[in-house]
Amino acid sequence: SQSIKLYNQLANHKLFNKSINFDLKRIKLVLKKLNNPEKRLTNVINILGSDGKYSLLTSLKFFIEANGQTTSAYISPSLKNIKDRFWLGNRYITYKEIKKTLKLIIKQKIPLTTFEVLTVIYIINISNRNNNYNLIEAGALFAKDSTNLFSFPLIQAVVNINKQHLNFLRKKT
């Protein structure tokens, strides 16, 4: 499937790696080279924690859209395929849009983790859309998570943090 091919391309590309590396310098540099598209996003709602992020995000999305407003959404991990991660306001991202954005990221020649690449794909594809709210599922280690790029999020909601993640957390997280 196209989804598996894209995941393999990410996993096997020399600039991208699957490791976890909590450092925002790389992703900030890529975004700076791309004219800081994250700064065009307003009404960001970050959802942090271990368990329940997807449930909260989809509930918020439903309530907001039922009220006639538009949302974008970034979830992790995918439920069925890579496109599931990216809701652009009225539809999921297309494979063509993912590939086009991936080429743009590769041109920057900056090594990124796979999660950082996916985050940049989301940011680029929603930065010129006028969604009323942008819902972003973050990791439990939010302070160093690649989704922690927005200067003034509207809301930062925290759901349950399970015991297996507690050993990663520090006072400033």
Where are these regions (language model features)?
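Conserved beta-strand/loop subsegment of P-loop NTPase cores
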Residues: 155-162
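ATP-dependent carboxylate-amine ligase catalytic core
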Residues: 24, 31-32, 37-40, 65-151, ...
